[in-house]
Design a protein with these regions (language model features):
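Periplasmic/extracellular loop-to-transmembrane helix junction in inner-membrane transport proteins
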Residues: 27-73
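Transmembrane alpha-helices
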Residues: 127, 131, 164-197, 225, ...
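C-terminal transmembrane helix and the adjacent membrane-cytosol boundary/short C-terminal tail
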Residues: 90, 177, 181, 224-260
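Glycine-rich helix-loop "coupling/hinge" segments at transmembrane-helix boundaries
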Residues: 117, 145, 192-230, 253-259
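N-terminal signal-anchor transmembrane alpha helix
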Residues: 3-31
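Transmembrane-helix boundary motif in ABC transporter permease subunits
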Residues: 70-100, 113
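Generic hydrophobic transmembrane alpha-helix motif, especially the helices
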Residues: 101-136, 143-144
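Short cytoplasmic-facing helical segments at TM-TM junctions of multi-pass membrane proteins
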Residues: 140-179, 211
Length: 260
């Protein structure tokens, strides 16, 4: 069954761009240096194209993407494994509960500053991204495993279906919707947390470093341009990951029904 589209509507984007443009014009009219307070969409777009024409732009984008998505993938792997363990053993869930509560309640900035004591700025974004992604993925996958159809599991036990077949034929199809929901939430969180780690840790050659430099030199158009890059990369990889999950789910459905 297809889900109702929740994509951003073009008219809504245009509306907020107009609001942004009007606000920038009002500030320029009210203050001599109003452009320093809020760059216009046109200025940001021009600056974005200028940055995209440099090799340093692509190196920074690749650097941040590799570190932030690396942390995301590491967290997903660990969260799925520990969720499966917690679903099987109650003590494992009880053991992890305080850790999950701490991660969810402590501010990201506190984790970043503490992590800088132990880690270099180059690996900081990986660690922080993984740390922030872990709780939602763990919680969703654990919920998905626990909501697996008990009648199917009973049938698998009666017919002595191997564990591998139970995982691919029962657990995965019923857990994927929960994992998909977690990915939608976690990808946005990891980009925000990872970029914050780069800004505070001044990770060399990263988007976060460019944001910090733009702030120090009052380059408002650069600040907005790099922010737009983060938004675009986050949206792009969310679409790619969700597409991959959907394709995987369709392939499993085909395997289950022997479709060609």
């Amino acid at each position: 069954m297809r889900r109702k589209s929740r994509s951003v509507r073009l008219w809504a984007v245009v509306f907020w761009l107009i609001v942004w443009q009007l606000a920038a014009m009002a500030l320029r009219a009210a203050y001599p240096h109003g452009a320093l307070l809020l760059a216009s969409p046109n200025a940001v777009l021009r600056r974005l194209f200028a940055l995209a024409g440099t090799a340093a732009f692509w190196r920074a984008a690749l650097h941040s993407t590799a570190h932030i998505l690396g942390g995301f993938l590491i967290a997903c792997a660990i969260a799925v494994a520990l969720a499966a363990l917690s679903a099987r053993y109650r003590r494992a869930e009880e053991l992890l509960a305080p850790l999950i509560a701490v991660i969810k309640s402590v501010p990201v900035a506190s984790f970043i500053i503490l992590a800088l004591v132990w880690l270099s700025s180059r690996t900081l974004a990986i660690f922080i991204s993984a740390l922030i992604v872990f709780p939602p993925v763990y919680a969703n996958v654990l919920e998905g495993v626990r909501r697996t159809d008990a009648s199917l599991l009973e049938m698998a036990r009666v017919f002595r279906v191997p564990l591998r077949r139970q995982i691919t034929g029962i657990y995965l199809p019923q857990t994927l919707p929960y994992f998909r929901s977690a990915v939608r939430t976690a990808l946005g969180l990891c980009w925000k947390a990872g970029t914050a780690a780069e800004v505070i840790g001044l990770s060399g050659g990263s988007i976060g470093e460019r944001l910090y430099t733009a702030k120090v030199y009052f380059q408002t158009d650069d600040l907005f341009a790099w922010t737009a890059v983060i938004v675009l990369l986050s949206a792009l990889f969310e679409k790619l990951f969700l597409l991959a999950i959907n394709r995987f789910a369709e392939r499993m459905d085909c395997d289950a029904t022997d479709c060609k």
